[in-house]
């Protein structure tokens, strides 16, 4: 990940609860968009569940350290464990959960964070309609080389409706899209 923030610049987003059932919060604009999206999905008989949103520094640090430890326990060296962990759990200073824009979205009938979520009706619905609500699939399977992250069909990011529609139309990852925009 090349989007690390200097440690002195901890984001302080204005948060709002986005999912009453889980209590997960997002940045206020993203939370409102998520609520609208969840209601639209409900109209199509799909119950979206926001399983994770904003995380404070301690939560992000804990998640990263747990990922590193998991790789250490599987026999990786410290350096290899950190490198592998960074493909599944961004370092705390690079985590989008700090901004309140990163969102782990599953469905009531499919609550496992694994690639099998990509085979669900909820994922198909998100692929078709999330951009209309300002969300993009953050780490698409076909863009892993560009993002440096493994495919996570449950991990979405709020970028606003216009940006989401443009990114979806481009077929690029957020990194690729931003790089292209900078050349214009």
Describe these PLM feature segments.
Residues 1-184:
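Extracytoplasmic cell-surface/polysaccharide-interacting catalytic and binding patches
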């Amino acid at each position: 990940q090349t989007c690390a923030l200097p440690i002195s610049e901890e984001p302080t987003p204005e948060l709002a609860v986005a999912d009453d059932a889980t209590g997960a919060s997002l940045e206020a604009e993203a939370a409102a968009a998520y609520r609208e999206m969840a209601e639209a999905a409900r109209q199509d008989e799909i119950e979206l569940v926001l399983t994770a949103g904003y995380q404070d520094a301690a939560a992000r640090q804990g998640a990263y350290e747990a990922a590193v430890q998991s790789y250490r326990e599987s026999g990786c060296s410290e350096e290899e464990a950190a490198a592998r962990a960074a493909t599944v759990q961004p370092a705390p200073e690079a985590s989008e959960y700090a901004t309140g824009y990163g969102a782990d979205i599953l469905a009531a009938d499919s609550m496992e964070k694994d690639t099998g979520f990509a085979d669900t009706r909820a994922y198909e619905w998100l692929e078709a309609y999330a951009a209309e609500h300002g969300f993009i699939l953050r780490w698409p399977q076909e863009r892993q080389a560009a993002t440096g992250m493994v495919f996570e069909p449950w991990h979405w990011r709020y970028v606003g409706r216009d940006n989401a529609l443009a990114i979806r139309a481009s077929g690029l990852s957020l990194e690729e899209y931003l790089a292209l925009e900078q050349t214009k």
